[in-house]
Amino acid sequence: MNLRLKRWITAGATLAMVATMGLSACSTNRALSSETGKNEVTMASRTPNWIFPISAKGYTQGENGQFIQSLYRPLFAYKSTSETPYKINLPKSLGQVPDVSEDGKTYTITLRDDAKWSDGTPVSTRDIEFWWNLVTNNKDQWASYKEGFFPDGASLAVLDEHTFSITTTDAFNPSWFIDNQINKVALLPQHAWDKTSADEAVSDLDRTPEGAQAVFAYLQGEAKDLSSYAKNPLWQTVNGPWKLSSFTPDQGLELVPNENYWGEDKPKIDKLIYKAFTGDDAEFNSVRSGAIDFGYIPAASYNQRSAVESKGYNVFLWPGNTITYLALNFAPQAPGSKFINQKYIRQAMQQLIDQPTLSEKIWSNTASPTCGPVPMPADKVGTTDGCVYKFDPDAAKKLLEDHGWKVVPDGSTTCENPGTGDNQCGEGIEAGDALSFKLGL
């Protein structure tokens, strides 16, 4: 049984808003923003706790990805409205559209020739090779790795300073492979990071398994030292639009423009401030006082939207691709496992979840019902049309009664027909057992 509610913003927020002044600063040039007397924007955000572009287990929160992409541009960025093959957003990508061989096994990619690191060093395929060597020799440390998937069954060939190819042993659907496998490739500044200590000279250590493991251990260790982020020279070598200027764990950070950024989407403000809050109430108090430029309205406070807009904020929904669900404990030692192991009970539980009412009353219509994590047809989005187990208390009651239960609304439902037959309660359930569960938060 899963409760799947589509939320409309990432990082646990429900609505986002930008102050009129802040929005102008983000969308106009610096001269115009200076006329408003505001050259910086403050936004509500959980403070990231990972900066190394190779993901690590336990550090894959959304705010980490957003933070890293502001400092390091990806091989491929995407845009749903892009007319480029594979929906690649070329202005924000370091790579051009891949050329796929006729047999579907070789992907040849050319890097932009104008991209460079913040110290002026050109971005090159050596940075691709550096990533490849670190990842393939430290697979067990990479959060995105799954045995049998990329880079397993694949090989890298560096063709020149700006061109490389990846060849697979099997042919895959190019759209899937480019958008879900090759997009994991990250360019890392080999000229600044290929070492095992702060005072060691950079060399080609990554080109041996032992060296790659030592370099990876060093970089990962530095990434775990959050208090050093802003002053560590490692993290000052970036190729994205921003550089880190200040970082206080659990409190916030400040970004300033990367003056050597090569892209067209250069920052239009002088400083971007991420401010962390202890909870929704503290954040929303800052919104109501006008203390931040970009934040969110918690779902429970959505009825205060008009008051927020009266402060000069522009309120808008921010679609988020996520679901909310109940995680069931199937462990044999769990108190309710003998019930959860019964498929018909899980089906009945799903039929007792009133997604439409939850979406309306709890989430203030900032969430919508769904059947599960697989996207629904466009004309069904936001409904339970086509869901196998819609909200249907009568059907849930009948399902339980058909399996030997005495259902008592608002009371204790007990097993009257124990056993493993089709019309019985199921294995491990005894006569008189009450159907109950413990919820953990």
Task: State what each model feature region is.
Residues 22-25:
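C-terminal motif of bacterial Sec signal peptides marking the signal peptidase cleavage site
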Residues 27-29:
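Bacterial signal peptide processing site
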Residues 37-48, 106-109, 131, 164-166, ...:
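Short, well-ordered beta-strand elements
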Residues 44-102, 133, 237:
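N-terminal lobe/hinge region of extracytoplasmic solute-binding protein
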Residues 96-142, 159, 165-167, 283-286, ...:
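Aromatic- and charge-enriched surface segment that lines or borders ligand/interaction sites
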Residues 135-145, 155-158, 245-260, 273-337, ...:
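Extracellular/periplasmic solute-recognition and catalytic clefts
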Residues 147-219:
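Surface-exposed binding/hinge segments that line
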Residues 340-441:
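Append "and occasionally in soluble cytosolic enzymes with long acidic Gly/Pro-rich linkers
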